[in-house]
Regions:
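Terminus-proximal functional modules
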Residues: 1-70, 75-82
Length: 82
């Protein structure tokens, strides 16, 4: 699974969806996604990440689809910062 970055329509907010691997298990499995969220103040500067949470893959997919319906777009502009 890969990392996805979405940016809002007005380009002021960002969400990063990435696989979350449990470290307590002997063999790490990816059964959850970590969703980090933050604000973009200037396009050429690093976004300020406000927090993150861990969701099931199904819940993360649902949120991802809802954000796309709201007009958020997939981007790779900030890939070098994460």
């Amino acid at each position: 699974m890969e990392k996805f970055t979405l940016i809002s329509k007005d380009r002021s907010r960002i969400k990063v969806f990435e696989p979350f691997e449990g470290v307590s298990k002997p063999s790490p499995r990816i059964d959850a996604m970590m969703i980090s969220y933050g604000c973009v103040y200037k396009r050429n500067s690093k976004p300020v990440m406000k927090g993150s949470r861990v969701e099931t893959i199904e819940a993360a997919r649902k949120e991802y689809a809802e954000l796309l319906k709201e007009g958020w777009k997939k981007t790779s502009i900030f890939r070098s910062y994460f």
